Amino acid sequence: MGSEAAAARPVVVTVNGERYEAVGVDPSTTLLEFLRTRTPVRGPKLGCGEGGCGACVVVVSKYDAVADEVTEFSASSCLTLLGSLHHCAVTTSEGIGNSRDGFHAVQRRLSGFHASQCGFCTPGMCMSIYSALAKADRCSSRPSPPPGFSKLTAAEAEKAVSGNLCRCTGYRPIVDACKSFAADVDLEDLGLNAFWKKGADDERADVGKLPAYSGGAAVCTFPEFLKSEIRSSMGQANGGAPAVAVTGDGWFHPKSVEEFHRLFDSNLFDERSVKIVASNTGSGVYKDQDLHDKYINISQILELSAINRSSKGVEIGAVVSISKAIEILSDGGAVFRKIADHLSKVASSFVQNTATIGGNIIMAQRLSFPSDIATVLLAAGSTVTIQVAAKRMCITLEEFLKQPPCDSRTLLVSISIPDWGSDDGITFESFRAAPRPLGNAVSYVNSAFLARSSVDGSSGSHLIEDVCLAFGAFGAEHAIRAREVEEFLKGKLVSAPVILEAVRLLKGVVSPAEGTTHPEYRVSLAVSYLFRFLTSLANGLDEPENANVPNGSCTNGTANGSANSSPEKHSNVDSSDLPIKSRQEMVFSDEYKPVGKPIEKTGAELQASGEAVYVDDIPAPKDCLYGAFIYSTHPHAHIKDINFRSSLASQKVITVITAKDIPTGGENIGSCFPMLGDEALFVHPVSEFAGQNIGVVIAETQKYAYMAAKQAVIEYSTENLQPPILTIEDAVQHNSYFPVPPFLAPTPIGDFNQAMSEADHKIIDGEVKLESQYYFYMETQTALAIPDEDNCITLYVSAQLPEITQNTVARCLGIPYHNVRIITRRVGGGFGGKAMKAIHVAAACAVAAFKLRRPVRMYLDRKTDMIMAGGRHPMKVKYSVGFKSDGKITGLHFDLGMNGGISPDCSPVLPVAIVGALKKYNWGALSFDIKVCKTNVSSKSAMRAPGDAQGSFIAEAIVEHIASTLSVDTNAIRRKNLHDFESLKVFYGNSAGDPSTYSLVTIFDKLASSPEYQQRAAMVEHFNAGNRWKKRGISCVPITYDVRLRPTPGKVSIMNDGSIAVEVGGVEIGQGLWTKVKQMTAFALGQLCDDGGEGLIDKVRVIQADTLSMIQGGFTGGSTTSETSCEAVRKSCAALVERLKPIKEKAGTPPWKSLIAQASMASVKLTEHAYWTPDPTFTSYLNYGAAISEVEVDVLTGETTILRSDLVYDCGQSLNPAVDLGQVEGAFVQGIGFFTNEEYTTNSDGLVINDGTWTYKIPTVDTIPKQFNVELINSARDHKRVLSSKASGEPPLLLASSVHCAMREAIRAARKEFAGAGGSPLTFQMDVPATMPIVKELCGLDVVERYLESFAAKA
């Protein structure tokens, strides 16, 4: 290699204390890929590949032999490259605790606080918490905590998981588990857990009852032998080392800037084949579409990691991590501290720990990355030092950003930030607007302002002497300074006319490029931030009494309440920094014990340790191949040819599986909903939607398959094809619909025309729209197909429909059903997305494995999954409604179009669900025309509460429209039109059940008519009167949800040692199915035991779903699978009890194990299979609930903070209150995402473009209600239901519309404040989702200008 580089040596790392040499590893290998393919570790998961979800978080430890110090930090293993980790130690969730060595306190507490459902996110969650604990405990300046606690504060505990995504739990129990370690927490405030019984007089919260925590030192993250090896290698290096160290194949580690440049001069590579890396976090934003041959690791160049402080300021080396920069700047002056505060909201902690300051700025300069850091440092007057070859120069950051994009030879050495000291004349503020307050989201706009000013003695306002105004992320190539505005402001005394003119000038400066999303909103944000800044320098602007104009650094939802507000209203605090509080109320029953007990979810500790096995955790069989979809990007076109952009990609491809590879006698079928229709597996011969599967690339590794699929070049032709139908409007124009079978069609009620004739008031052609929602299960679609003898095949699939998957795969291959075996142990989140859509992956794997006669595995990358998934149905509704002057509704008619996509899937089922949820109110007469539109987009499918979520919201939109028209309180309209039992029976028929079970009126009155609600509503009104730029709203929403009971099988087998194996048709997808089934098994067999069966729970194992073992398994969905599975198991147990009773009676009261031994000796059959079917007269029932939500809207930015949500849900006699509580909270938060911030966007061809964690934002810990209260009530007994229980999985999602309704009330208050904001101040259409841009638009994009104009006019 020449004198510039040594011979390559293998990368040496330790994983959980075990030493590994990475020999023959591709240089582009990530740590996650290495862990999952070269070690036994399976805890870290691939959730996104972007550093945006936290599923892959590990702890990395580095040893400084000179200082004899170990530093450790959390990191995203999906982004961290293995080649950069030579002589590092890696600790995963298995490494801190496991089933053999004992679980760690973090793992046990996550389990005990019921904080793990599907469990796919839990190992990463575990490591984020562990890392935060270890970091706090290492801080010597903090006081020692009481025994059992850590040095972590409760606020830090919450933020520890702010970058980790969870789609199941709603975060509240995770936050409680985190806070249980904090010394400043009140344990009584923590939620339901397995360690003490809340509210019990004899069971007080006590740290001694929690799993013991003794500090981070209990886990050795860096083994001594590796320290010795490092010291030894240093000794060898001192004896004469080559200029540049080399590890692996193609990794170079220069130690100086000179060595870096000599590498380029040595002709070892060309610039196009080399990648410069320090942390590689940028690849989460800009995914490499090809692999690089060479990598230069600049993180070991000492000069680039130096930090120099002086009286002039601080110079930060380019490879200093963001977290280190925050630490350094936090210890400086006022400007430095505000910069640090802003930086703390950039990315998650596990990205901040590795991402570098220089890397962020380089991305802004080269790739137009919307950097917060560049904007803030630009405003602070920063300079950068760069070096090209032998030439080093220091230029302003502004100059650097304006230069042509840097090439690979240009090295950013450092960034210098001047020290502005403690001059009272200096004001520095920074702002950002993003969907997540704590930062795990790119800004819509970021800005930073620095002014030198003096106070004018006569007016009290500031005279601006000099000013810097920086704006970024608004749609320009890079952050800019608003020079024209700066020049205008210099020498001006800040006043309303001056601010108004500055704002007008700014609108000509901040100009988003064509194609930028929400351009008007971004300009309005920039105006709002300049207004906030300048208002802080002004005096005498007319404000309401007690008003507070929000200003300050990083105002993500900054809220200042009225001074007269009560503490419960959180007055005078920043609402984004409020601690999350909660309350849970429920009734526990011993009647059917252990059924009804809030026991921990089965397998939760295994999930936390990473030992729970998902499909992609199954070890790859010998000769396994890997697949990735090539999908169409055109909605309607002939596929002419498939090629690959690079020769490397084509070299890695073994074959491409297409429709021609389906076996003779097989069908091109990817999914099939019984009696409704099929969907093709492969394009043949015409692509019918963007995202359709053209073929499957097969390669030797999953990475090569991904790479080749991304490099695929498709030749299209649209000759002789009609233009695509993409929208509901297109479908209506072309009369393109799917039929709804008569047996699925909902039934109208009454005479609408007669009802309208009786109305005092009418609304004609009201309209509302609802967009789609992506499932965002943490585990993407995955399958492993293993061919077997005699044309048989076994597939491990993450599926909610194993039986239908088996049938479809068999049809696709042209073989009998019994030749196909589908095995599903657990699913990493489903929500309906692992129903029909999972079948495509299974069938594609099966075709490939069948043809190649080798195992084939597929694990979809997040982008492909999002593009192909389909998601929730978009809908457009027009309605006409008549009502009396007192608010009583006489009749409703609505026309609804839903976008079903290219195939029926489950779409024809949705009309009855839409109408079912909408019928929660007595509409008098109800008629409708529902069209299921056939379009050239991916098929929409069932997503949690399909149709019901939309139908319930449509009802609320109509009711709010009525209330607005009559100028009355919306709750009065709601209450007046709730059913009595007679009308309920008319609208719902047999589902209404008995009068005693109708609890909705009681629930609604409990909330909406309570004195507390009236007081809170008055306080909201008081707050709004005293605050111009913050408005609050409060709303109470009732729900009704009709669920269906389905036949379900169950099998119970008692082993000779007394252990019990149980099989059910349902699949464990995180909903607690296994836990409830175990409880039911113990209860049903309990009459054979002295303790009533409680001792049997630990003897029960529920085993994986297997279609050859458990036929007629049905499907997991519709919220009732758990209860019907329990009933099937109870039926099986009843037969076993009858057989065992004679043995028990003959032997007296033998212990369980002895009883089974005697039965076995007597040849008693110890297994029983049952197939439970519901009573034909009771196949469905209604679920009821209500929720009050209170929100605060920032009129200037559109940001919404959910201050409080109170949920009351009728759970019947809960089979497991802890599981049901988790379902209620998780569904509610998923609903918050649907109604407020999950923006599902497509391009002009219908291709999904919000296709990753960077652009699609599900709720996070910082976006859930600050006060989150849930009460589960037990309604009247109904023994027609399973032990009087009720469903909990889907209905509570509908309650989240209360947040949307509260937002509407807050916006209405803003529109009253600024009358005439684009129309009537009271009546307006607010579609779903109500994202920040939508909220701001409804509040008024020009409220600042209109306010200033009105103020100036008064003056």
From Swiss-Prot:
Positions with biased composition (Polar residues): 548-566
All copies of domain FAD-binding PCMH-type, residue ranges: 244-422
InterPro entries, per database record: 2Fe-2S-bd (IPR002888), 2Fe-2S-bd_dom_sf (IPR036884), 2Fe-2S_ferredoxin-like_sf (IPR036010), 2Fe-2S_ferredoxin-type (IPR001041), 2Fe2S_fd_BS (IPR006058), Ald_Oxase/Xan_DH_a/b (IPR000674), Ald_Oxase/Xan_DH_a/b_sf (IPR036856), Ald_Oxase/xanthine_DH-like (IPR016208)
Primary enzyme class: oxidoreductase
A single BP term in Gene Ontology: abscisic acid biosynthetic process
Gene3D superfamilies recorded: 3.10.20.30, 3.30.465.10, [2Fe-2S]-binding domain, Aldehyde oxidase/xanthine dehydrogenase, a/b hammerhead, Aldehyde oxidase/xanthine dehydrogenase, molybdopterin binding domain, CO dehydrogenase flavoprotein, C-terminal domain
Catalytic activity entry: an aldehyde + O2 + H2O = a carboxylate + H2O2 + H(+)
Binding, [2Fe-2S] cluster: C48, C53, C56, C78
Swiss-Prot/TrEMBL keywords: 2Fe-2S, Abscisic acid biosynthesis, Auxin biosynthesis, FAD, Flavoprotein, Iron, Iron-sulfur, Metal-binding, Molybdenum, NAD, Oxidoreductase
Cofactor: binding comment: Binds 2 [2Fe-2S] clusters. Binds 1 Mo-molybdopterin (Mo-MPT) cofactor per subunit.
Region (Disordered): 544-577
Keyword NAD: yes
MF terms in GO: 2 iron, 2 sulfur cluster binding; aldehyde oxidase activity; FAD binding; iron ion binding; oxidoreductase activity
Bilayer-crossing regions: none
Keyword Iron among record annotations: yes
Domain of life: Eukaryota
EC number, as in UniProt: 1.2.3.1
Cofactor: [2Fe-2S] cluster; FAD; Mo-molybdopterin
Limits of the 2Fe-2S ferredoxin-type domain: 9-96
SUPFAM superfamilies given in the database record: 2Fe-2S ferredoxin-like, CO dehydrogenase flavoprotein C-terminal domain-like, CO dehydrogenase ISP C-domain like, CO dehydrogenase molybdoprotein N-domain-like, FAD-binding/transporter-associated domain-like, Molybdenum cofactor-binding domain
Family statement: Belongs to the xanthine dehydrogenase family.
PANTHER family: ALDEHYDE OXIDASE 1-RELATED, XANTHINE DEHYDROGENASE
UniProt subunit comment: Aldehyde oxidases (AO) are homodimers and heterodimers of AO subunits.
Record-given protein name: Probable aldehyde oxidase 2
Organism of provenance: Oryza sativa subsp. japonica
Phylogenetic classification of the source organism: Eukaryota, Viridiplantae, Streptophyta, Embryophyta, Tracheophyta
